[in-house]
Regions:
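N-terminal Sec-pathway targeting helices
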Residues: 1-20
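Flexible, surface-exposed loop/linker segments and immediately adjacent secondary-structure boundaries
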Residues: 19-61, 65-70, 77-174, 178-230, ...
Length: 280
Protein backbone atom coordinates (compact mmCIF):
# COMPACT_ATOMS: atom_id res chain seq x y z
CA UNK A 1 0.00 0.00 0.00
CA UNK A 2 1.28 3.45 -0.86
CA UNK A 3 2.55 5.36 2.17
CA UNK A 4 0.29 8.32 1.64
CA UNK A 5 -2.79 6.08 1.76
CA UNK A 6 -1.99 5.01 5.32
CA UNK A 7 -4.07 7.93 6.53
CA UNK A 8 -7.83 7.34 6.77
CA UNK A 9 -8.71 10.83 5.56
CA UNK A 10 -6.05 11.12 2.86
CA UNK A 11 -3.34 13.70 2.44
CA UNK A 12 -5.58 16.42 1.00
CA UNK A 13 -7.92 16.50 3.97
CA UNK A 14 -5.20 15.82 6.54
CA UNK A 15 -3.04 18.73 5.49
CA UNK A 16 -5.89 21.16 5.78
CA UNK A 17 -7.33 19.75 9.02
CA UNK A 18 -4.02 19.77 10.87
CA UNK A 19 -3.42 23.30 9.67
CA UNK A 20 -6.80 24.57 10.78
CA UNK A 21 -6.84 22.79 14.16
CA UNK A 22 -3.30 23.44 15.33
CA UNK A 23 -2.23 26.46 13.32
CA UNK A 24 -5.48 28.33 12.69
CA UNK A 25 -3.89 31.68 13.43
CA UNK A 26 -1.42 31.13 10.59
CA UNK A 27 -3.83 30.01 7.88
CA UNK A 28 -6.44 32.49 6.78
CA UNK A 29 -7.86 30.60 3.78
CA UNK A 30 -7.90 33.90 1.90
CA UNK A 31 -8.70 33.72 -1.80
CA UNK A 32 -6.24 35.73 -3.88
CA UNK A 33 -7.97 38.04 -6.36
CA UNK A 34 -5.26 37.86 -9.03
CA UNK A 35 -1.94 36.04 -9.07
CA UNK A 36 0.89 35.77 -11.60
CA UNK A 37 2.60 32.57 -12.65
CA UNK A 38 5.81 33.10 -14.62
CA UNK A 39 5.70 30.06 -16.89
CA UNK A 40 8.79 30.77 -18.95
CA UNK A 41 11.39 33.46 -19.65
CA UNK A 42 11.15 37.13 -18.70
CA UNK A 43 7.78 38.56 -17.65
CA UNK A 44 7.30 42.16 -16.54
CA UNK A 45 4.68 43.89 -14.38
CA UNK A 46 3.75 47.57 -14.19
CA UNK A 47 1.77 48.56 -11.08
CA UNK A 48 1.93 52.26 -11.90
CA UNK A 49 5.62 52.90 -11.31
CA UNK A 50 7.11 51.47 -14.49
CA UNK A 51 7.96 48.00 -15.68
CA UNK A 52 9.76 45.62 -13.29
CA UNK A 53 10.48 41.90 -13.38
CA UNK A 54 7.44 39.84 -12.41
CA UNK A 55 7.85 37.20 -9.70
CA UNK A 56 6.26 33.77 -9.83
CA UNK A 57 3.32 33.66 -7.40
CA UNK A 58 3.12 37.43 -6.89
CA UNK A 59 -0.28 39.00 -6.27
CA UNK A 60 -1.70 41.42 -8.83
CA UNK A 61 -4.20 44.23 -8.40
CA UNK A 62 -6.72 46.05 -10.55
CA UNK A 63 -5.04 48.21 -13.24
CA UNK A 64 -1.79 46.23 -13.06
CA UNK A 65 -0.24 45.55 -16.47
CA UNK A 66 1.62 42.38 -17.46
CA UNK A 67 3.76 41.84 -20.55
CA UNK A 68 5.68 38.77 -21.62
CA UNK A 69 8.33 39.95 -24.10
CA UNK A 70 9.88 36.57 -25.02
CA UNK A 71 8.40 34.81 -22.00
CA UNK A 72 5.08 33.20 -21.12
CA UNK A 73 2.83 33.81 -18.12
CA UNK A 74 -0.52 32.88 -16.59
CA UNK A 75 -2.79 35.19 -14.61
CA UNK A 76 -5.05 33.30 -12.19
CA UNK A 77 -8.24 35.13 -11.20
CA UNK A 78 -9.85 34.26 -7.84
CA UNK A 79 -8.03 30.91 -7.81
CA UNK A 80 -10.01 29.46 -10.68
CA UNK A 81 -10.12 31.42 -13.91
CA UNK A 82 -6.97 31.74 -16.02
CA UNK A 83 -5.60 33.97 -18.75
CA UNK A 84 -2.38 32.66 -20.30
CA UNK A 85 -0.11 35.06 -22.17
CA UNK A 86 1.91 33.91 -25.15
CA UNK A 87 5.21 35.71 -25.98
CA UNK A 88 5.01 39.39 -26.95
CA UNK A 89 1.64 39.90 -25.27
CA UNK A 90 0.47 42.71 -23.01
CA UNK A 91 -2.66 42.76 -20.85
CA UNK A 92 -4.02 44.73 -17.91
CA UNK A 93 -6.55 43.91 -15.19
CA UNK A 94 -9.45 46.26 -15.85
CA UNK A 95 -12.09 44.82 -13.52
CA UNK A 96 -11.73 42.39 -10.62
CA UNK A 97 -14.80 41.27 -8.69
CA UNK A 98 -16.93 38.16 -8.33
CA UNK A 99 -19.67 39.89 -10.31
CA UNK A 100 -17.41 40.58 -13.28
CA UNK A 101 -13.73 40.24 -14.13
CA UNK A 102 -12.27 41.93 -17.21
CA UNK A 103 -8.87 41.49 -18.83
CA UNK A 104 -7.87 44.20 -21.28
CA UNK A 105 -5.62 42.73 -23.98
CA UNK A 106 -3.55 45.33 -25.76
CA UNK A 107 -1.47 43.07 -28.01
CA UNK A 108 -0.42 39.50 -28.70
CA UNK A 109 -2.20 36.22 -27.98
CA UNK A 110 -3.95 34.87 -24.89
CA UNK A 111 -5.69 31.65 -23.95
CA UNK A 112 -8.52 32.01 -21.45
CA UNK A 113 -9.89 29.17 -19.31
CA UNK A 114 -13.15 29.73 -17.44
CA UNK A 115 -13.59 26.90 -14.93
CA UNK A 116 -16.42 28.36 -12.81
CA UNK A 117 -14.35 27.39 -9.76
CA UNK A 118 -14.07 30.98 -8.57
CA UNK A 119 -17.73 31.96 -8.63
CA UNK A 120 -17.05 34.83 -11.04
CA UNK A 121 -20.37 35.45 -12.78
CA UNK A 122 -19.00 37.02 -15.97
CA UNK A 123 -15.54 37.06 -17.55
CA UNK A 124 -14.61 39.50 -20.30
CA UNK A 125 -11.58 39.87 -22.53
CA UNK A 126 -11.41 43.24 -24.24
CA UNK A 127 -9.12 44.38 -27.04
CA UNK A 128 -8.91 47.99 -28.27
CA UNK A 129 -11.78 47.28 -30.70
CA UNK A 130 -13.60 44.12 -29.52
CA UNK A 131 -15.01 42.37 -26.47
CA UNK A 132 -15.55 38.66 -25.71
CA UNK A 133 -17.92 37.70 -22.88
CA UNK A 134 -18.16 34.20 -21.43
CA UNK A 135 -19.59 32.28 -18.49
CA UNK A 136 -17.57 29.07 -18.65
CA UNK A 137 -15.45 28.01 -21.62
CA UNK A 138 -11.96 27.99 -23.11
CA UNK A 139 -10.96 30.35 -25.90
CA UNK A 140 -8.02 32.13 -27.49
CA UNK A 141 -7.75 35.80 -28.46
CA UNK A 142 -5.19 36.83 -31.08
CA UNK A 143 -4.47 40.44 -32.08
CA UNK A 144 -2.68 40.92 -35.40
CA UNK A 145 -2.59 44.54 -36.53
CA UNK A 146 -6.19 45.69 -36.89
CA UNK A 147 -7.51 42.13 -37.00
CA UNK A 148 -8.84 40.32 -33.92
CA UNK A 149 -9.35 36.53 -34.00
CA UNK A 150 -11.32 34.59 -31.39
CA UNK A 151 -10.67 30.81 -31.34
CA UNK A 152 -13.19 28.78 -29.33
CA UNK A 153 -12.01 25.48 -27.87
CA UNK A 154 -14.97 24.83 -25.57
CA UNK A 155 -18.46 26.21 -25.10
CA UNK A 156 -19.78 29.38 -26.71
CA UNK A 157 -18.40 32.93 -26.56
CA UNK A 158 -20.23 36.17 -27.33
CA UNK A 159 -17.88 38.16 -29.58
CA UNK A 160 -18.22 41.46 -31.39
CA UNK A 161 -16.95 44.97 -31.89
CA UNK A 162 -17.17 47.27 -28.88
CA UNK A 163 -20.57 48.88 -28.64
CA UNK A 164 -22.35 45.96 -30.34
CA UNK A 165 -24.35 43.10 -28.84
CA UNK A 166 -21.89 40.51 -30.12
CA UNK A 167 -22.59 37.20 -31.82
CA UNK A 168 -22.20 33.66 -30.45
CA UNK A 169 -19.10 31.78 -31.60
CA UNK A 170 -19.29 28.05 -30.84
CA UNK A 171 -16.71 25.38 -30.09
CA UNK A 172 -14.55 24.57 -33.12
CA UNK A 173 -15.16 27.94 -34.77
CA UNK A 174 -13.24 31.17 -35.15
CA UNK A 175 -14.59 34.71 -35.17
CA UNK A 176 -12.57 37.33 -37.06
CA UNK A 177 -13.20 41.04 -36.74
CA UNK A 178 -11.59 43.42 -39.13
CA UNK A 179 -14.94 44.59 -40.47
CA UNK A 180 -17.44 42.97 -40.34
CA UNK A 181 -17.38 39.82 -38.15
CA UNK A 182 -16.60 36.65 -40.12
CA UNK A 183 -17.08 33.10 -38.76
CA UNK A 184 -14.96 30.20 -40.03
CA UNK A 185 -14.18 26.70 -38.77
CA UNK A 186 -10.86 26.27 -37.00
CA UNK A 187 -8.07 24.83 -39.13
CA UNK A 188 -5.81 22.03 -37.91
CA UNK A 189 -3.02 24.37 -36.81
CA UNK A 190 -5.48 26.36 -34.69
CA UNK A 191 -6.91 23.15 -33.20
CA UNK A 192 -3.41 21.98 -32.31
CA UNK A 193 -2.71 25.32 -30.59
CA UNK A 194 -5.90 24.99 -28.55
CA UNK A 195 -5.05 21.40 -27.56
CA UNK A 196 -1.65 22.57 -26.37
CA UNK A 197 -3.25 25.32 -24.30
CA UNK A 198 -5.64 22.83 -22.70
CA UNK A 199 -2.65 20.70 -21.66
CA UNK A 200 -1.11 23.81 -20.14
CA UNK A 201 -4.39 24.43 -18.27
CA UNK A 202 -3.92 21.12 -16.47
CA UNK A 203 -0.40 22.03 -15.35
CA UNK A 204 -1.54 25.48 -14.17
CA UNK A 205 -4.37 23.94 -12.15
CA UNK A 206 -1.97 21.45 -10.56
CA UNK A 207 0.34 24.30 -9.60
CA UNK A 208 -2.57 26.27 -8.13
CA UNK A 209 -3.71 23.24 -6.13
CA UNK A 210 -0.23 22.72 -4.70
CA UNK A 211 0.01 26.42 -3.80
CA UNK A 212 -3.19 26.13 -1.76
CA UNK A 213 -1.91 23.00 0.00
CA UNK A 214 1.42 24.68 0.73
CA UNK A 215 -0.34 27.53 2.53
CA UNK A 216 -0.47 25.03 5.36
CA UNK A 217 3.28 24.57 5.08
CA UNK A 218 4.05 24.15 8.78
CA UNK A 219 1.40 21.46 9.16
CA UNK A 220 2.59 19.82 5.95
CA UNK A 221 6.11 19.65 7.36
CA UNK A 222 4.84 18.01 10.55
CA UNK A 223 2.93 15.42 8.53
CA UNK A 224 5.92 14.63 6.32
CA UNK A 225 8.21 14.22 9.33
CA UNK A 226 5.75 12.20 11.41
CA UNK A 227 4.79 9.73 8.69
CA UNK A 228 8.05 9.66 6.73
CA UNK A 229 6.52 11.19 3.62
CA UNK A 230 8.52 12.86 0.88
CA UNK A 231 7.45 15.43 -1.69
CA UNK A 232 7.46 12.58 -4.21
CA UNK A 233 4.97 10.62 -2.06
CA UNK A 234 2.61 13.58 -1.98
CA UNK A 235 2.96 14.16 -5.71
CA UNK A 236 2.24 10.48 -6.36
CA UNK A 237 -0.82 10.61 -4.13
CA UNK A 238 -2.19 13.58 -6.05
CA UNK A 239 -1.39 11.84 -9.34
CA UNK A 240 -3.33 8.76 -8.22
CA UNK A 241 -6.35 10.96 -7.57
CA UNK A 242 -5.97 12.72 -10.93
CA UNK A 243 -5.67 9.37 -12.70
CA UNK A 244 -8.90 8.15 -11.12
CA UNK A 245 -7.23 5.54 -8.89
CA UNK A 246 -8.42 7.29 -5.72
CA UNK A 247 -11.75 9.07 -5.17
CA UNK A 248 -11.32 12.62 -3.90
CA UNK A 249 -14.95 12.79 -2.74
CA UNK A 250 -14.52 9.75 -0.51
CA UNK A 251 -11.42 11.30 1.05
CA UNK A 252 -13.25 14.57 1.66
CA UNK A 253 -16.24 12.80 3.25
CA UNK A 254 -13.96 11.31 5.89
CA UNK A 255 -12.79 14.75 6.97
CA UNK A 256 -14.42 15.82 10.27
CA UNK A 257 -13.89 19.47 9.34
CA UNK A 258 -15.08 21.15 6.15
CA UNK A 259 -13.29 24.40 5.29
CA UNK A 260 -12.91 26.52 2.20
CA UNK A 261 -9.35 25.46 1.35
CA UNK A 262 -10.35 21.79 1.31
CA UNK A 263 -13.34 22.60 -0.88
CA UNK A 264 -11.11 24.55 -3.27
CA UNK A 265 -8.57 21.73 -3.54
CA UNK A 266 -11.33 19.22 -4.28
CA UNK A 267 -12.96 21.52 -6.87
CA UNK A 268 -9.64 22.11 -8.64
CA UNK A 269 -8.99 18.36 -8.62
CA UNK A 270 -12.35 17.72 -10.28
CA UNK A 271 -11.50 20.25 -13.00
CA UNK A 272 -8.13 18.57 -13.58
CA UNK A 273 -9.83 15.19 -13.89
CA UNK A 274 -12.39 16.61 -16.30
CA UNK A 275 -9.64 17.93 -18.58
CA UNK A 276 -7.73 14.64 -18.29
CA UNK A 277 -10.86 12.65 -19.02
CA UNK A 278 -10.59 10.67 -15.76
CA UNK A 279 -13.66 12.11 -14.01
CA UNK A 280 -16.10 9.46 -12.82
Amino acid sequence: MKKWLWFPIGILALIVIVGIVFFASLTSGKVIGAMLYVDEGVVQVDSGNGWVAGQDGMELSINDKVRTLEGKATIVIFEGEMTRLEPNTEVSIKELSLESATISQNSGSTWNRLTKLSGVAEYNVETPTTVATVRGTGFGMVISGQQNDLLVGEGTVSFGAKGTAGEPISEGWKGTIASPLVKTQLNQEEKNWINGQMSNDIESLKKLRLDIINRHGFALGVIKTTFGLTDADIEQGLKDIDDGKTDEDELAKQSPIQIDDLDRVIAITKEIKKLLGTAS
